[in-house]
Curated annotation (Swiss-Prot):
This is Thymidylate synthase. Pathway: Pyrimidine metabolism; dTTP biosynthesis. Keywords: Cytoplasm, Methyltransferase, Nucleotide biosynthesis, Transferase. PROSITE patterns: THYMIDYLATE_SYNTHASE. Belongs to the thymidylate synthase family. Bacterial-type ThyA subfamily. Its EC number is 2.1.1.45. Its main location: cytoplasm. Coiled coil: none annotated. (6R)-5,10-methylene-5,6,7,8-tetrahydrofolate binds at residues 51, 169, 263. Catalyzes the reductive methylation of 2'-deoxyuridine-5'-monophosphate (dUMP) to 2'-deoxythymidine-5'-monophosphate (dTMP) while utilizing 5,10-methylenetetrahydrofolate (mTHF) as the methyl donor and reductant in the reaction, yielding dihydrofolate (DHF) as a by-product. This enzymatic reaction provides an intracellular de novo source of dTMP, an essential precursor for DNA biosynthesis. It catalyses: dUMP + (6R)-5,10-methylene-5,6,7,8-tetrahydrofolate = 7,8-dihydrofolate + dTMP.
Length: 264
């Protein structure tokens, strides 16, 4: 995970001090890209322990098209709790946009199903793009999409994914985002009969919150360990049929977790 650690160090050393929506304050850079070859191991940060259950269940929740935290709460995942209303609703966030984007004529579009079908039909297409940034529905969202657009690319029988993330909380959020989209790439590849290539992560405003500086410095003192591997149930070939039990991360041996507050 050298690219991630290089980003941490660069922002600590060269980032600009900026105010932000939460009032916490950040150190930030604009425009940063990381590339991970998914054949070299699963890109899961090892210099601190990540909560795997949250990463996997959140992605399955997105793919269900769900926007209520009930499913997450049932599986002891709390990462969206701060933004939900009293009924657990978040408005038309990621799951709604991925699976039920509302077009100008009011017809709902299943972007993810279209994506799987289009990769099979036309793998050389330059239009294999999914967007969560639905301008007309942004005001109704509890949190506007941070990881807002992603594109797939097929060459030599391998599927690569590039994510554009407009805003990245480097210490807490970005490690989750890397793992989530790497996992999604593997799942889409299996559903379309392809191997995996690269995951490319492009960040707009990449920032460290001011109350994460010491945690980031502590993380940078740790020596990275070998990357784990991902094992998917080979019998699952429908992207929307994956369950938690079908996904296994093997050989994950991280350093201890480092606690840090979430900026809401």
């Amino acid at each position: 995970m050298k690219p991630y650690l290089e980003l941490l160090q660069h922002v600590l050393d060269h980032g600009a001090e900026k105010s932000d929506r939460t009032g916490t304050g950040t150190r930030s850079v604009f425009g940063w890209q990381m590339r991970f070859d998914l054949n070299d191991g699963f890109p899961l940060v090892t210099t601190k322990k990540l909560h795997l259950r949250s990463i996997i269940h959140e992605l399955l929740w997105f793919l269900k098209g769900d926007t209520n935290i009930g499913y997450l709460s049932d599986h002891q995942v709390r990462i969206w709790d701060e933004w939900a209303d009293d009924n657990g609703d978040l408005g038309p966030v990621y799951g709604k946009q991925w699976r039920r984007w509302t077009g100008p004529d009011g017809v709902e579009i299943d972007q993810m199903q279209w994506l799987v079908d289009e990769i099979k039909r036309n793998p050389d297409s330059r239009r294999l793009v999914i967007s969560a940034w639905n301008v007309g529905e942004l005001p109704q969202m509890a949190l506007m999409p941070c990881h807002s657009l992603f594109q797939f690319y097929v060459v030599n029988g391998k599927l690569s994914c590039q994510l554009y993330q407009r805003s990245g909380d480097i210490f807490l959020g970005v490690p989750f985002n890397i793992a989530s989209y790497a996992l999604l790439t593997h799942m889409v590849a299996q559903a379309t009969g392809l191997g995996v290539g690269d995951f490319v992560h492009t960040l707009g405003d990449a920032h460290l919150y001011s109350n994460h500086f010491e945690q980031a410095r502590e993380q940078l003192t740790r020596t990275p360990r070998a990357l784990p591997s991902l094992r998917l149930n080979p019998e699952v070939t429908d992207l929307f049929a994956f369950r938690f039990e079908d996904i296994a991360i093997e050989g994950y041996d991280p350093h201890p977790a480092i606690k840090a507050p979430v900026a809401v």
